[in-house]
Design a protein with these regions (language model features):
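Short, well-structured secondary-structure segments
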Residues: 187-199, 214-219
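His/Asp/Glu-enriched short active-site or ligand-binding loop at hydrolase and phosphoryl-transfer sites
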Residues: 41, 213-227
């Protein structure tokens, strides 16, 4: 599995920026492309906007540098975090072509699937499938369908020592635990050290947060102390 976290994305994006002349405007393809686009705009000290705002002629996200006159913009770089089949950028190119701006537009991604020609899209590194990124792994449908998750410290926060009393305080925690990372698609299963006797509360929480799974495996011990 090829994994990239936020820190590695930051480093790779800055390394990418050093190889290219700065544009007048950086455009991020939402959602994931907004992250490297923001890093690039800050590094180059240029204006930033989302693809949708760009298409609508709003060349600023409303803070920091901005262009009062669109005629000031000569070069634009449109950025996404990665490319695989190229469908997202193909759609973005269609929208940009339809907008019919007069300035020069370049296309870039930080990570490509391989070294093939992506139709004038520049990229920084090759990271092959299967790959997961910290900033969007919960929405990776294919990977999630084969994955097995824990709950405490993963889907939700861990209970405090006071909450973890194996009684009513713990039951209240199980029903109301603040979520952390929730899968956006069905997962293969859940394995937890929670006790079997707390299955009703656990299943209620999972249903409340729309977590879909095939199997929930819990520990069959009478008390937390006996685990």
């Amino acid at each position: 599995m090829n994994w990239r976290n936020y820190g590695e994305l930051m480093i790779d994006t800055i390394d990418f920026a050093k190889k290219w002349d700065k544009p007048d405007l950086v455009v991020g393809i939402a959602r994931s492309g907004i992250i490297p686009a923001t890093i690039l705009a800050l590094h180059w000290n240029v204006s930033l906007c989302s693809l949708q705002d760009y298409i609508n002629g709003q060349f600023s996200m409303g803070c920091g540098l901005r262009y009062q006159d669109p005629k000031e913009i000569k070069n634009v770089m449109i950025v996404d975090d990665s490319i695989h089949m190229g469908g997202t950028i193909a759609e973005a190119k269609r929208l940009v072509k339809k907008a019919n701006f007069n300035h020069k537009v370049g296309w870039a991604v930080i990570y490509a699937d391989d070294d093939k020609d992506y139709e004038n899209i520049i990229f920084h590194k090759t990271i092959r499938q299967g790959r997961l990124f910290q900033w969007n792994w919960t929405s990776h449908k294919e990977m999630l369908s084969h994955s097995v998750w824990d709950i405490d410290g993963c889907m939700c926060v861990k209970p405090t020592v006071e909450q973890n009393d194996d009684g009513e305080k713990y039951r209240k925690f199980l029903l109301n635990a603040p979520p952390l990372y929730l899968p956006q698609y069905p997962i293969n299963g859940i394995v937890t050290s929670r006790l079997e006797k707390f299955r009703p509360e656990t299943e209620q929480w999972l249903k409340k947060h729309n977590v879909k799974y095939k199997e929930l495996i819990m520990l069959n011990y009478p008390t937390g102390r006996s685990r």
